[in-house]
């Protein structure tokens, strides 16, 4: 393929799953960056709520311990505190909801005039890719299947259960339209670094938009249980410069010489 990524480079950028990983993979699209930012914003409010609740709990245990207060206080009504614990949670939910809805709607937006259209078809248990812009005839089409490389055939530096024989090559900083469907059962096309997860449903076309911002190799997997070999349907996206992408396409259409 065009870019030969070593294992160190892939792990350093965190574009593939790692053992014992707890955080996100590095964002390669505005969509994924928005997801990470939203997570951090919500986590800020969660930490504040956690600290406040723990403070109230510790204070109650300390000041209202039964040995210090043998006779419990009988508080049955408090208008002020009831108003406060209704208003403040509502404000917090509003601060969480507004950016989350904005991100949700932006993820559903479809580019009106994409520079490139890619179709992914799920099978048991591999993916078929069609570059629709080049499929002008049966003699000239850009379609291929992508299977997982068996463990015994892996080369040094390749990732177990994540490498494929044919990678999907896309240009960076280009508006892409991805059409996802299935030829048999439910699948799901998901690449964490790109912030993409689209269900592949038989008889239905789902589409999403992508804008890969940096070159690299991005790994994903089928994220919908689809049978015995569900875990062996990896996805590999190789993002290259526009020049390298054009050369890659041109080389595929060069007729073989005898």
UniProtKB/Swiss-Prot annotation:
Q: What UniProt keywords are attached to this protein's entry?
A: Copper, Electron transport, Magnesium, Membrane, Metal-binding, Mitochondrion, Mitochondrion inner membrane, Respiratory chain, Translocase, Transmembrane, Transmembrane helix, Transport
Which InterPro entries does the record match to this protein?
CcO_II (IPR045187), CcO_II-like_C (IPR002429), CcO_II_C (IPR034210), Copper_CuA (IPR001505), Cupredoxin (IPR008972), Cyt_c_oxidase_su2 (IPR014222), Cyt_c_oxidase_su2_TM_dom (IPR011759), Cyt_c_oxidase_su2_TM_sf (IPR036257)
Q: What is this protein called?
A: Cytochrome c oxidase subunit 2
Indicate the segments annotated as coiled coil, or none if absent: none
> What is an example of a Pfam family matching this protein?
COX2
Gene3D superfamilies reported for this sequence: 1.10.287.90, Cupredoxins - blue copper proteins
The organism that produces this protein has a lineage beginning with: Eukaryota, Viridiplantae, Streptophyta, Embryophyta, Tracheophyta
Gene (UniProt): COX2
Q: Say what the protein does.
A: Component of the cytochrome c oxidase, the last enzyme in the mitochondrial electron transport chain which drives oxidative phosphorylation. The respiratory chain contains 3 multisubunit complexes succinate dehydrogenase (complex II, CII), ubiquinol-cytochrome c oxidoreductase (cytochrome b-c1 complex, complex III, CIII) and cytochrome c oxidase (complex IV, CIV), that cooperate to transfer electrons derived from NADH and succinate to molecular oxygen, creating an electrochemical gradient over the inner membrane that drives transmembrane transport and the ATP synthase.
